[in-house]
Each structure stands twice: as C-alpha cells, then as structure tokens.
C-alpha cells in the first residue's frame, strides 16, 4: 500500500472499496426503504386505524422475511409470547416485570443453544427491538403512561413497525401511534431522510475501507519510524495499540452505519418527530459519532453510542434497579444490554468492563469536581452550576486528560472486534480464549488503569 502513488491509491480506493461497498449497501436496503415509503403513503389515505396497524404488520413481516427468510419465526414466536403474557396479566400492576422475566427466559433458552448459534445471532437485532418495545410498553402501562392494553393488531403493529423492525431504533408506543396517523410529507422530512441515508453510506464506506485501505495509507509515516526503532518491545507495543485503535474505529463506524440507517428508515416511515408551533421537526437522533470519537468521558461515549437504547436502559432498567443500590443498578443495566445484544463471552467482557470503567470514572470525577470546585464532571455542567472554576486552563487540561483516557479505553475494548476475523467466527461470537489473548497482548492496561483510578478515588475520599 505504501508503494502506491497518491493517484493510484485513490483510484484503487474508489474502484476496490468505495463503489462496490455503496452498491452492495444499496442493493441490501433499497427494498426496505421502498416498503417504508409505501407504508408512509398508505397511511396518508385516511384508512381506518386497524388497517393502518395491519399494513405495518404486513410490511414488517415482509421486511423480516427479506432479510432473514424463515428464521424470522423466532421473532414471531417471541412477539406472540409477549402478547400472551400481556393479555394474561392485563389486570396486574406488574406487567413490565412479567414481560421482562418472560423475555429473559426466552433469550436465555435461545442463547443456550435451543437454536443454532449462527442463526440465533443473525436474528438478535430484530429480537432486541421486539423485546425492548414489549418491556417498555409493559412498564408504561404500569405507570399509566399508556391508558389501556392495546388490541392484538395495535400491539403487533407497534412491534413490527416497518421503520424499526430490522435495524431499529427503539421507539415508544406513543411515537408509533403518531407515525401511523400519516403526517403530511414535507421538505424537512425528505431532507432528514436524505441526510441520514447519506451519512449511513459514508459510515459504511469508512467502516469497510478503514482496515484494508485508509488506515495503512495514513499511518505508515509513524509506522516506518516504529520499524526503525531498535527497541523491539516498544515497537511491538505501539503496533499492537495502533491495530487495536484500527479495529475500534472500524467497529465504531459499523455501529454508526446502523444508527444512521435506522434514522433513515424510521423517519421515512413517519416516526421520529416533535411537534413545533407551526411545523413538525424531524429530529430523530440515534448516534452522535463526534461524542464517541472525541469524547469528554466514557459516560458520554455510552450515552452517545445509541441514544434511544441509552434512554430505554436508563428509564426501564436502571431506574427500576436503583432499589438495589447505584453500583448494583449499573451492573444490572449492563447485564440487560449484554443479553439483548446476544450473550457471548467477549461482549459480556466488554460490557462488564464498561460498567466498572464508567462507574469509577463517574465517582472519581465527581469527587475531584467537589474538591477542586471545577467543571470536570463526566457530563457537562449546566450554565448555572456552583463550581468556581469553569473554563480555566486547568479545567480544560483535566477534561482533555480524561478525554484522552476515554480514547485509550475505547481502543482497548475495541481491540476485540478484529477487522481480520472471518464472518463465521464473528456471527458465532468470540470465545474466552480469544478475549484473553487480545487483552493480554495489551497487558490488560485498561483494567489496571481503572483499578488505579479507583484506588486514587478511595485515597482522596
């Protein structure tokens, strides 16, 4: 790659990665986009509500079959089981808990090889959306935010809403009901769809081309110096960390691709808006890439990774688990996230590590903010905060230090998502030996740094 001239490099990049990636991406999603738009137009016709719900069920079923063929039966079975439990518990005040337990048992049975591992993991995205919607609806019914148990066609319409069933994101039952009302088409709506779709394709290109093309082209200047380094240990350590960062960035952009694509499909189908005085603001946001790549803190990374899911975990898991204590609630929240994403050792290890990293970072920065009276909390302070030091050089330096530490943690955690691993291994999940090997190569650095931060927090307490 380093022997290419600049013109040859960009020509190879265009023909070997950019164009094929965009073409394959559009080939995969054009039918889903068409179905979303067709449903959007259908709901503008003023049909009876039950026909609107039935149409989105039909669109959702067709989309599932297009992507997963007959494997979609496992998603259908989960949705039927959820409505059965909801109907049987319709007079209970703990419907959210009953639905959560039912879904937990179902997902655990699937993870324990009731179904072929590769098949099960292919379905986990759609299963996750169905599970999140069912649980949120149960708790909203318990809290009185939804007045009555939906009819079967309303319930299935919500779960199989064509704009979210394949790629997400999670939306509330209220947002779904607003979507099927068939709001007017507008320039703002079309602009939002086009922007989200363009960003999705850009992130897909970056995710696919970072490893084989972009990263090796831009890094060699530093890499050549490393290769001339007489100290092999230092050279090897730096190369391993660069590879870890490469894997992390590629994984990040694959997540942004799904996030922006889910924005496009949900908005195209009519969801994801807020009502202003004289117009609708199409403002659905799933991911904030800049907050992840240039973070203030790991807490900001976690919330910006997937905003709807972060809201769901906070509102329906963390708040309900707070009675167990803050740290226990954090662990329960990350455990729920691991189960929803498809329980595998490497994912559980990443999420458990994230739980400790974010908790230690939060309490340490909170303690330092109190001692120094400075705006160095994990989240940005409000304009009327009581801290004496807000924008000074020392405050900026500390925030930059914690931001650099967050990038360090992200590189370490992202090293598990190796861009060179074959698809079958990725679908089955990485085992314990692989996880231990990858983190051993990096000397377990992130865990040791987190432990050191916790010791420091205890010492200054």
Swiss-Prot record:
Cellular component, GO, one term: endoplasmic reticulum membrane
Keywords of the record: Acyltransferase, Endoplasmic reticulum, Membrane, Transferase, Transmembrane, Transmembrane helix, Wnt signaling pathway
Catalytic reaction equation(s): [Wnt protein]-L-serine + (9Z)-hexadecenoyl-CoA = [Wnt protein]-O-(9Z)-hexadecenoyl-L-serine + CoA
Extracellular face of the membrane: 39-66, 117-152, 220-252, 359-396
Source domain of life: Eukaryota
Record localization: Endoplasmic reticulum membrane
Outcome after substituting residue 340 to A: Abolished acyltransferase activity
Topology in the lipid bilayer: Multi-pass membrane protein
Main subcellular location: endoplasmic reticulum
Spans traversing the lipid bilayer: 18-38, 67-87, 96-116, 153-173, 199-219, 253-273, 338-358, 397-417
EC identifiers of the protein: 2.3.1.250
GO annotation terms (biological process): glycoprotein metabolic process; protein lipidation; protein palmitoleylation; regulation of postsynaptic membrane neurotransmitter receptor levels; Wnt signaling pathway
UniProt note on tissues of expression: Expressed in brain, heart, kidney, liver, lung, muscle, spleen and testis. Isoform 4 is strongly expressed in kidney, liver, lung, spleen and testis. Isoform 1 is strongly expressed in brain, heart and muscle and poorly in kidney, liver, lung, spleen and testis.
Family the entry assigns: Belongs to the membrane-bound acyltransferase family. Porcupine subfamily.
Quaternary structure and partners: Interacts with WNT1, WNT3, WNT3A, WNT4, WNT5A, WNT5B, WNT6, WNT7A and WNT7B.
Protein name, as recorded: Protein-serine O-palmitoleoyltransferase porcupine
Organism annotation: Mus musculus
Encoding gene (name): Porcn
């Amino acid at each position: 790659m380093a022997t290419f001239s600049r013109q040859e490099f960009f020509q190879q990049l265009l023909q070997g990665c950019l164009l094929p990636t965009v073409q394959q991406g559009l080939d995969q999603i054009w039918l889903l986009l068409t179905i979303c738009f067709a449903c959007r137009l259908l709901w503008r016709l003023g049909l009876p509500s039950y026909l609107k719900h039935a149409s989105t069920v039909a669109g959702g079923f067709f989309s599932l079959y297009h992507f997963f063929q007959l494997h979609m039966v496992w998603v259908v079975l989960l949705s039927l089981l959820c409505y059965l439990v909801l109907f049987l518990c319709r007079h209970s005040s703990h419907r959210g808990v009953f639905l959560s337990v039912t879904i937990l048992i179902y997902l655990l049975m699937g993870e324990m090889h009731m179904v072929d591992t590769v098949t099960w993991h292919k379905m986990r995205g759609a299963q996750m959306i169905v599970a999140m919607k069912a649980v949120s609806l149960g708790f909203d019914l318990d809290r009185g935010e939804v007045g009555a148990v939906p009819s079967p066609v309303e319930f299935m319409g919500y779960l199989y809403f064509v704009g979210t069933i394949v790629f997400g994101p999670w939306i509330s039952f209220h947002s779904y009901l607003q979507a099927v009302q068939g709001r007017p088409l507008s320039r703002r709506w079309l602009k939002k769809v086009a922007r989200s779709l363009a960003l999705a394709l850009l992130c897909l290109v970056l995710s696919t081309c970072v490893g084989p093309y972009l990263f090796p082209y831009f890094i060699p200047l530093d890499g050549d110096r490393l290769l001339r380094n007489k100290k092999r240990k230092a050279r090897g350590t730096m190369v391993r960390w660069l590879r870890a960062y490469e894997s992390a960035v590629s994984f990040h952009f694959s997540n942004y691709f799904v996030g922006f694509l889910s924005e496009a499909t949900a908005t195209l189908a009519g969801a994801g808006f807020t009502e202003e005085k004289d117009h609708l603001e199409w403002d659905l946001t799933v991911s904030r890439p800049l907050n992840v790549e240039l973070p203030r803190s790991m807490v900001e990374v976690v919330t910006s990774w997937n905003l709807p899911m972060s809201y769901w975990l906070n509102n329906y898991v963390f708040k309900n688990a707070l009675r167990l204590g803050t740290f226990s609630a954090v662990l329960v929240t990350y455990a729920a996230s691991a189960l929803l994403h498809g329980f595998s050792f490497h994912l559980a290890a990443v999420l458990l590590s994230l739980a400790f990293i974010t908790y230690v970072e939060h309490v340490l920065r909170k303690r330092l903010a109190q001692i120094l009276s400075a705006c160095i909390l994990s989240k940005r302070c409000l304009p009327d905060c009581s801290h004496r030091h807000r924008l000074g050089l020392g405050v900026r330096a500390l925030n930059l230090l914690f931001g650099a530490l967050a990038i360090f943690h992200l590189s370490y955690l992202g090293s598990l998502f190796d861009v060179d691993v074959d698809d079958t291994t990725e679908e089955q999940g990485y085992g314990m030996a692989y996880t231990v090997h990858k983190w051993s190569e990096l000397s377990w650095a992130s865990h040791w740094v987190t432990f050191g931060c916790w010791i420091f927090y205890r010492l200054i307490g």
